Amino acid sequence: MTVETQKETLGFQTEVKQLLHLMIHSLYSNKEIFLRELISNASDAADKLRFEALAKPELFEGDADLKIRLSFDKDAGTVTLEDNGIGMSREDVIAHLGTIAKSGTADFMKNLTGDQKKDSHLIGQFGVGFYSAFIVADKVDVYSRRAGQPAAEGVHWSSKGEGEFEVATIDKPQRGTRIVLHLKKDEQEFADGWRLRNVVKKYSDHIALPIQLPKEQAATEGEEQPAEEWETVNRASALWTRSRTEVKDEEYQEFYKHIGHDFENPLAWSHNKVEGKLEYNSLLYVPARAPFDLYQREAPRGLKLYVQRVFIMDQAESFLPLYLRFIKGVVDSNDLSLNVSREILQKDPIIDSMKTALTKRVLDMLEKLAKNEPEKYKGFWKNFGQVLKEGPAEDFANKEKIAGLLRFASTQDDSGEQSVALADYLARAKEGQDKIYYLTGESYAQVKNSPHLEVFRKKGIEVLLLTDRIDEWLMSYLNEFDGKAFVDIARGDLDLGKLDSEEDKKAQEEVAKDKEGLVERLKGALGDSVAEVRVSHRLTDSPAILAIGEQDLGLQMRQILEASGQKVPESKPIFEFNPSHPLIEKLDHEQSEDRFAELSHILFDQAALAAGDSLKDPAAYVRRLNKLLVELSA
């Protein structure tokens, strides 16, 4: 019997207690996953040992045949999972099995919803799958020793999954980790060879490490019990090295769950073998749901990197651009050196070639998803659309391709849903329309009721409605699509080109000439508040509108700069008025210059509010409006 020394009882971190409660009560219906999670951890431990042994071969301790062994004892009601991977020291055990990584703790608890399906997804995402053992076990013992440490520095961790755990130092001649699950009374079904085999085949067939179970054999009466033999029950080959025709969808899905720490199936995947100048295999996945840290651009991201089937690193970020940071997967290269580092990855020209090809592969996969499964793409867009919008600024070479994947709300319907592709917009364009018209704003309600749309509604011209915070910044990088220029309908002097008839243009010129006097009066009244005053071609129903100067920053960009503490360049709007509106006609006939100025400022402030802007002096606006209301009610 192993002698235990330095025994201590420690309390679980508060979050672990909550997590254990959640595991036991919320994931009961999907209890088989405990085995998948423990096998996944054992596989990672083998990967880590292989990687560390590249520099220190002595860590193999004469045993480089890495494997996972599963056994059971019906009488004792236990299931044991053993690996000869990297193993854990006493410090590792306390850190990994007593706490959740500090960086993820707050986010994890904040993201819990009470919805079992969603929460099970989070558990995988935060790499806390070990605790799923308590779904089926009322006590768990872990025996481990880190590779390279003396046999006397083994460690025994034990817990009933309540509030505390025990840790003791033990002798452990073999490196690696052995986990013994003491099954609950109603979970004894798992102490069975066929049951364990089925779960392994279902969830872990893709694991590249051999998963072994004792061979099922019975001794003939009178004969000795045969020596225990082990048989491998999974394929034990790297899934990404196999031919696509050999791999079933279910295998791709389970492999994704393993590498993506996700409980949901992926939306799409792309598996490729590249031969020729460069040789590598890639298997790339689009997740179904956004991770909690998607908008933290510094968060760890990237693909699992293997070189000649040897695991090198997680989160190798050099293979895909930042705007595709949600993609999960594996890349296995034959051309890179086994001692490759993150620093080398950033400078290696081979990586640049692979990055170009892998980026194209992802964009092709998204195009295919959008074309063949529009409903699934709609889900993708809801989760990842805002991140994809970073693409045109980061990836000039693929700008047109990315633009084709973007989705927008538009005046085509009143749903406010971002479902319109640029290709769809152009297919519906009016005859003679050579521009793509759009309007940015704070919210869908604000832009859909904007006076800027009036002339477009009258002429039946569709306008894209852009309300994401990133949109104005995005459009500063998107100049055209399919040869058609983008036009912000709130910017500069609106020119509808062939969509305006010669009669329209002639009438506009005549009105502008006729209202020159009013233009000058308004300039005098509004003074430094405006850059220019002119007759509007945009309005049919509203009295006035504010347009942005051709080179000026729009409202969204100004707000982004202000929020980040940057200096915002000074700019003034252009005040446009509708000459046929009754208010403007009355204003034109106003004899009192003081009253003219008061009314002009009210119209200016109303136009600013309609544009979604805030007033520089709201009190002055209220005072003028109250004065006007008093006059009207007298």
Curated annotation (Swiss-Prot):
Keywords: ATP-binding, Chaperone, Cytoplasm, Nucleotide-binding, Stress response. The lineage of its organism: Bacteria, Pseudomonadati, Pseudomonadota, Gammaproteobacteria, Pseudomonadales. InterPro entries: HATPase_C_sf, Heat_shock_protein_90_CS, HSP90_C, Hsp90_fam, Hsp90_N, Ribosomal_Su5_D2-typ_SF. It comes from Pseudomonas putida (strain ATCC 47054 / DSM 6125 / CFBP 8728 / NCIMB 11950 / KT2440). It is found in: Cytoplasm. Homodimer. SMART domains: HATPase_c. Molecular chaperone. Has ATPase activity. Residues 560-634 are annotated as: C. This is Chaperone protein HtpG. Gene3D superfamilies: 3.30.230.80, 3.40.50.11260, Heat shock protein 90, C-terminal domain, Histidine kinase-like ATPase, C-terminal domain. Belongs to the heat shock protein 90 family.
